[in-house]
Amino acid sequence: MRTSKKKKASLELFEKNKVYSLEEALEILEKMPKAKFEESVEVHIKTSIDPKKSDQQVRGAAVLPFGTGKTVKVAAFTETQQKEAQEAGADLVGGAELVEKISQNKELAFDVAVATPEMMPKLAKIAKILGPKGLMPNPKSQTVGAQIKPLVEGLKKGKVSFKNDDGGNIHQVVGRRSFSKEQLKENLDFFLEEIKKNKPAASKGKFILSMTLASTMSAGIKFK
């Protein structure tokens, strides 16, 4: 069955413009044809913020109860806590020498980076390499801290960072198709609460305008 056929088959399982409950959306998703690979389950949230205004940015982090199902490779930039970073499970650990290595070969064999504060001036050297890929450690995304161990451990347990895109939307992987409905619901409930907690004070009125649930290859299901 081709991808286009799978998407067509998934569309036959629900009404495109109907808004379902989260439980109903998860039941529909479970019935959809599966791809030959392990698909991610994603939530797409449309907010009412004005993304052009600096005081209306949505940004934060959350440790999903059941993680995302993905093994995350973590790079830890630190001069003083390298042993702690290694013990916490960091895949790549180093200080100035690691910064220099990345500046030379531009290879990024990791999914997320954390750092201790003393490394931030040194990381400026590779900011143009890390930044475009969303890998630059930042206090707002809770990837910079005085203690490196909890930063690494949180990411290994399923911590995710989120922020709005240029359209004021938030996109997040919340699990895999192999997860149970209960696991996906718990992850989603937790993530949505974190989004609500991070509503900008400058954003007035209804914050979340719409939400869509989908897997990598499926059509999107609107839910509330």
PLM ranges: what are they?
Residues 1-15:
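Generic N-terminal amphipathic, Lys/Arg-enriched alpha-helix
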Residues 1-2, 50, 110:
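N-terminal cationic and glycine-rich segments that engage phosphates or anionic surfaces
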Residues 23-82:
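Translation machinery proteins
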Residues 25, 85, 131, 213:
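Residue-level signature of catalytic and energy-coupling elements of molecular machines
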Residues 37-41, 198-210:
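Flexible, glycine/charged-enriched surface loops at secondary-structure junctions
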Residues 47, 78, 116, 174-176, ...:
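Flexible glycine-/small-residue-rich
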Residues 90-194:
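Long, charge-patterned amphipathic alpha-helical coiled-coil/hairpin "stalk" segments used as oligomerization
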Residues 212-224:
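C-terminal edge-of-domain segments
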